[in-house]
């Protein structure tokens, strides 16, 4: 949806994100973790940007915990950068948890001076994504 928002009535309106969430699914988080041969469970996403013309996205998580043979390990990585082609990322979602959590309030920025409040959160997703 072509939402336009602005920081105040004195500022220019820009197309930008609002509060969009995935609907909760039916999968148990324990089953999602158990289904991963090798991967990472990511925590505390805090940054992201998109390229709407080319459908690319990049997000950052504070940390990730390695999963090996369906079990969380003691190996932490930080920070974690995720990137990819949005349609491919959405098609790769194979499990959606039955939990749902809204995490605090963040901000959507345009340049260095334009900020509006947004929220993030939702269910846990099992997805294939490029990490770097």
Regions found by a protein language model. Name each.
Residues 1-132:
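N-terminal small-residue-enriched
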């Amino acid at each position: 949806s072509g939402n336009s928002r602005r920081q105040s009535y004195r500022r220019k309106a820009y197309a930008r994100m609002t509060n969009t969430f995935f609907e909760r699914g039916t999968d148990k988080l324990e089953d999602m973790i158990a289904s991963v041969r090798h991967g990472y469970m990511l925590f505390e996403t805090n940054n992201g940007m998109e390229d709407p013309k080319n459908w690319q996205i990049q997000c950052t998580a504070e940390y990730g915990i390695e999963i090996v043979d369906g079990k969380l390990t003691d190996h932490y990585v930080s920070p974690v950068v995720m990137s990819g082609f949005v349609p491919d990322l959405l098609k790769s979602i194979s499990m959606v948890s039955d939990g749902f959590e809204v995490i605090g309030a963040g901000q959507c920025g345009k340049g260095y001076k334009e900020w509006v409040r947004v929220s993030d959160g939702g269910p846990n997703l099992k997805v294939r994504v490029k990490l770097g």
